[in-house]
């Protein structure tokens, strides 16, 4: 386990140096967005900047993205600094932890950061040297979510129930390849009622589902009610059970407890035994 991003880069320096391509794109694993990196690289090269950083402008930074960094920009979208989001302003440019630069500069920054402090991150060394470098920001458009804690995971799932939001993330021309799981279509019984929900294949639904997400192969028995919840694959909700504002983990069975309801502002988590 690496203590920061630079430690990971340093550990894999031999592979990085062996790559023959002149540019690097560094992107995070915990942020969800769609971006054409060919276009972003072209923008970076045409701008003449040393480093290009991707950001997303939001108007709710007081309540959300509190574990993210922000970019302070000048009128020409030059980056003045990278700072933590302290939640003291609603309008912020959330840094998407996405960088483009020449590979040689990337390697140089890693070595300079290591010489200063083992605790330095890539953002730290860019902050340290931003007066010596031409660092520019490029604005991202479309769906964006940062999964930094349980609450943001829940919120991102709820946001993607909205078909308009989902369409800005998922593009038929850019298919997402995942594990194949061949199963039959979901079976909706006569007693089933579904409203504003996303239901995967292979489910059996006899109860009510409202504003929720169901993974593959879930079983929802008669008179069960699921509201504002994320139910992961293989879960079973028993007859007459009410589940609201929850994340239900894979293969969980809720059969005997008849009501599992949390505050909408503090959704609950039901783990598998």
Task: Identify the meaning behind each predicted range.
Residues 114-273:
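Left-handed beta-helix
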